[in-house]
Amino acid sequence: DDGNGNPVCRDSSGGCVPWNIFERNADGTTAVTDEAAAFIAGVGIVTGETEQTVFGGTIEGDFTNMGIQSPMADAGLSGLIGFEMREDKLGRLADDISKISGGRGLTGTGGATLPIAGEIEVEEIFMEMSMPLITGKPMIQELGLTAGYRYSDYTTNGNGLSNSFDADTYFAGISWAPNDEVRFRFNQAVAIRAPNVFDLYVGINTGLVELSPVNGDGDQCSGPTPVATQAQCANTGLSAAQYGSVDPSAAGQFNLITGGNPNLVAEEGETTTFGVVITPSMIENLSVSIDYFDIEVTDAIGSVPAQTSY
């Protein structure tokens, strides 16, 4: 202050206008002036750009005329082979206000919006085939096999970091139609989901998370008898000496650190599907499909919610 209790700017070269945040008008409202409000306020601008380049090709063929067919079917093997090259780029630019947690510290916007620059390149080869086994027989109008395979080679770059990984995916299935109205199908597949640029290269950032006791998601490690065990709370950095002596947060808010991981590889899902399609001839334009799915995901890509991080 200026020695008389009035706020002053330590450095006024940037157009600083002082504001006493504790000063109130007679009606209890803040006594901030228009000039001071204009100085501390700002408009955060974030711009983004995405770009995708895809190049590929396929060759299809029917090998019935070459004699590659089942003796009990009226058609033979058909299939395709192909390749694809794909490049995905993403860029995000943030101004100075957006890159600061809470804007200028008083806007209450939470964590900072950090710039991102990254790209993912993938080269793939794939093949698919379909093979009728039996057609036009009693109780077997059509029985056939389908299968496919894809090899993917990924290269990622962003924020001066790079990584590479590959993945194999495939599927195999069988379909049986005893007549025109019913078809049963079974399929086994392995699929992947590769990490995107955000998963890989978003910067480490500290934001806010609500863990208010009001909604039942309070700090499980606070209070004299914490809900979480000492071992669980140790995962958050709480020492044994601190366990049972942490006061609940009066604000109900906590810092949460998030960020990408440039070492991520593709998550993998194994899927088993069994289904039936019913197309009753007595009801025109009606088709009913019933399917059962069993999906198991390994190396899943995601974040751990604050409520379950113990």
Q: Where do the language-model regions lie?
A:
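Extended hydrophobic-aromatic, low-complexity segments
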Residues: 137-141, 157-159, 195-197, 284-287, ...
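Surface-exposed, low-complexity loop segments enriched in small/polar and acidic residues
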Residues: 1-122, 162-163, 189-266, 291-310
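Surface-exposed extracellular loop regions of Gram-negative outer-membrane beta-barrel proteins
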Residues: 78-93, 116-177, 269-275
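Repeat-solenoid scaffold signature
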Residues: 162-194, 263-287
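Outer-membrane beta-barrel proteins
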Residues: 60-74, 130-138, 143-145, 153-155, ...
